């Protein structure tokens, strides 16, 4: 029976005090609905092709001297080359893949984005809100999947899709 199946991530079953009916609430997106959520959806919606209209991602950004704003909360003036930034990114990817480090701790320690304070979490976003290469990579990832190096005007990113 469908009611016995596990709910998608973020969803919980609640009882309406006013109507006495069961409804479903997503504590990540704050969405609520009467119908049981299906599949891997976290309330982010799907377009007509079954693609999500919103995703949630975390990232680790390494800026370099050619970044559009070569400074960060970690360093006032970033002087590393693009090649050095890519070496750092590839090193972080290896540490994550080997299990030596987890994504969130590396993002909080080494990301040049202020989202480091949130362990790299950028929250949910729709198409058109991020730089195109970042957006394309984010929407191409499956939930729980990590990207390789993604190049934008901001620098080089590792992206982890969380929803």
Swiss-Prot record:
Its EC number is 5.2.1.8. It comes from the Eukaryota. The modification N6-acetyllysine is found at residue 46. It is an enzyme of class 5 (isomerase). InterPro entries: PPIase_dom_sf, PPIase_Pin1, PPIase_PpiC, PPIase_PpiC_CS, WW_dom, WW_dom_sf. Residues 33-54 are annotated as: Disordered. Coiled coil: none annotated. Residues 52-163 form the PpiC domain. CDD domains: WW. It catalyses: [protein]-peptidylproline (omega=180) = [protein]-peptidylproline (omega=0). The modification Phosphoserine is found at residues 71, 108. Its main location: nucleus. One of its GO terms (biological process) is regulation of cell population proliferation. It holds the Pfam family Rotamase. Gene3D superfamilies: 2.20.70.10, 3.10.50.40. Residues 5-39 form the WW domain. The keyword Nucleus applies. The keyword Membrane does not apply. Keywords: Acetylation, Cell cycle, Cytoplasm, Isomerase, Nucleus, Phosphoprotein, Rotamase. GO terms for molecular function: cis-trans isomerase activity; peptidyl-prolyl cis-trans isomerase activity. Peptidyl-prolyl cis/trans isomerase (PPIase) that binds to and isomerizes specific phosphorylated Ser/Thr-Pro (pSer/Thr-Pro) motifs. By inducing conformational changes in a subset of phosphorylated proteins, acts as a molecular switch in multiple cellular processes. Displays a preference for acidic residues located N-terminally to the proline bond to be isomerized. Regulates mitosis presumably by interacting with NIMA and attenuating its mitosis-promoting activity. Down-regulates kinase activity of BTK. The WW domain is required for the interaction with STIL and KIF20B. Interacts with STIL. Interacts with KIF20B. Interacts with NEK6. Interacts (via WW domain) with PRKX. Interacts with BTK. Interacts (via PpiC domain) with DAPK1. Interacts with the phosphorylated form of RAF1. Interacts (via WW domain) with ATCAY; upon NGF stimulation. Interacts with PML (isoform PML-4). Interacts with BCL6. Interacts with FBXW7, disrupting FBXW7 dimerization and promoting FBXW7 autoubiquitination and degradation. Directly interacts with RBBP8/CtIP; this interaction depends upon RBBP8 phosphorylation. This is Peptidyl-prolyl cis-trans isomerase NIMA-interacting 1. It comes from Bos taurus (Bovine). The gene is PIN1.
């Amino acid at each position: 029976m469908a009611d016995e199946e596990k709910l998608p991530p973020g969803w919980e079953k609640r009882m309406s005090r006013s109507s006495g009916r069961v409804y479903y609430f997503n504590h990540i997106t704050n969405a609520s609905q009467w119908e049981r959520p299906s599949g891997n959806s976290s309330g982010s919606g799907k377009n007509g092709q079954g693609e999500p209209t919103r995703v949630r991602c975390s990232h680790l950004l390494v800026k370099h001297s050619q970044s559009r704003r070569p400074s960060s909360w970690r360093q006032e003036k970033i002087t590393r080359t693009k090649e050095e930034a890519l070496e750092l990114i590839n090193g972080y990817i290896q540490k994550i893949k080997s299990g030596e480090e987890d994504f969130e701790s590396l993002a909080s320690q080494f990301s040049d984005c202020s989202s480091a304070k949130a362990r790299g979490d950028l929250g949910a976003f729709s198409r058109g809100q991020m730089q195109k290469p970042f957006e394309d990579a984010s929407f191409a990832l499956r939930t729980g999947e990590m990207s390789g190096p993604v190049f934008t005007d901001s620098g080089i990113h590792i992206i982890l899709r969380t929803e």
